[in-house]
Amino acid sequence: MAAFILTPIPTPRHDGKDMLIRLAADQKKLRILTGCLLLAALPASWAQIRSADAALPEAPQPAPIPAIALIRANGIAAHPEDADPSGREPQDPPIVAMAPHPEDSIYWISGQANIIFQGRLPFHSAYEGTNSFRNSAEYKTSMVGTLFTAIRRNRSIRYNTDFIFDLESAGGRGLSEALGLAGFTNLDVVRNPNLGSTPYIARYEIHQIFGLTQKTVSQDPGPFALAPSVPVRRIEFRIGKVTLPDFFDVNGPGSDSHLQFMNWTIDNNGAWDYAADTRGYTVGGMAEYDDRAWSVRYGIFAMPTVANGIDMDWAFSRAHGQNGEFELRQSLIRDRKGVTRLLFFANRAHMGTYREAVEDFLNGSDTATYGVTVPTITLHAHFGALKYGFGYNTEQELTPNLRVFGRFGWNEGQHESYAYTEVDQTVLAGADYYGTRWHRPVDKIGLAVVSNAIKRDHQNYLHYGGLGFLLGDGNLNYGRETIVESYYNWHAWRGMFYALDVQHIDNPGYNRDRGAAWVGSVRAHIDF
């Protein structure tokens, strides 16, 4: 059996003056970037903005048919039912974009920019490895900008067609290069910082609706669905380049890192290893049936050639991700909104198994053949290997201002984590509260707790020094990774939002020998 020597790493000491100088410089850059984004986010003239005040659009509402996660791309929904408790006449709803979007247009042009500054204090660490969340003080800034464009070619209510094309740029870096945590602290961070910030095509989709009835229901037009009304019963098809969380595992209080929580395993189900490249996108198709109170959707999409890879495997016979979801819009409380979703996934890809990697390392065969000194799962990858799992997702309004939500996720855990993050089981509970009580109806407070876990084979792999695409401390004293996150999102003006956020991470990377860690964040967001 191979032996390992783990060198204790003391908590680094830093020159306070030097840290303050670097922090001030970084904050100055952040202010400059925010100012530039504000100038870029004013496509309408002053006259257009003044005229928009005379005829404000209706406040966006949670869609009765939430097949499209509009909240993820186009800002938050103001609740019209959040009446002022003082009994005064209702005020016009606030505008939540730099310029309003006409509901009857066949074109859609909008955008968003998101800047997140994160800093971490030093924390206890008995040792570090290649993929550790570093224990020294650190701060990083990430930037994401997206241009949403779409055209509605067939304006028939029963047979609507949308063509969607989005461009995106992601820059900056995450703390510790986004390594060392299963629930990383910033969803905007690209897991391969070497890709750079060059703009890329994020989405190209064809969206087709086939109505099954003449009866319609209204919906808020957005960048992924332009029709202001759709048939109550309908079939929808999408084909092209997408990101799966736009359509699956959507959750009103917990899906948007730009206006809500920032942690990977709070905004998405951490155990859902959904098909995606490093940036979070894939190519494929999906179908969806919608009725008044329920929906069912299914899609098949391309998988990457390697774990966390940017290149996709186009041989669908051996590599693909299948996803299905049932959604029931049934509230537990009268006159309040409530939704429950059941998700399943089954991925086939060039994956290895943790147990095989550990066994061949311990018996010396991998060391003799390949010269490796730790278990190496990539040496045991098999084409067509199957990884599967399921998820539960719920949200419920308790009052006009208060919503609670939760998730549970599980996957079989024998095959390597491949596309999203290294979680085999997750449990989440949280809530958000609108600021109507203090006359800030679009402001919001959020609080959530998520606890992530991995299976025994995965634990052993990390214990003997193996590396995943995110984790690897060189050793593992296993414990559940538990994260508490809280934020306040402040609506400054029109489409400008600022947020303060704090996260507490217990057992980072499932390691009881490290942590706990605190991460603070400041976020600037613009919708235009």
Where are these regions (language model features)?
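Transmembrane beta-barrel strands of outer-membrane/channel proteins
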Residues: 113-119, 165-169, 237-241, 298-302, ...
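Outer-membrane beta-barrel "beta-signal"
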Residues: 203-215, 447, 516-528
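N-terminal periplasmic/intermembrane-space "pro-region" immediately following the signal or transit peptide
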Residues: 4, 20-23, 39, 43-137, ...
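Outer membrane beta-barrel transmembrane domains
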Residues: 327, 343-384, 405, 412, ...
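Surface-exposed coil loops of outer-membrane beta-barrel proteins
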Residues: 180-196, 200, 215-325, 465-476
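Hydrophobic, lipid-facing positions within transmembrane beta-strands of outer-membrane proteins
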Residues: 107, 141-147, 200-206, 235, ...
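Residue-level signature of outer-membrane beta-barrel architecture
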Residues: 151-155, 208-210, 241, 288-291, ...
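Short loop/turn motifs that connect adjacent beta-strands in outer-membrane beta-barrel proteins
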Residues: 97-109, 121-122, 150-163, 211-234, ...
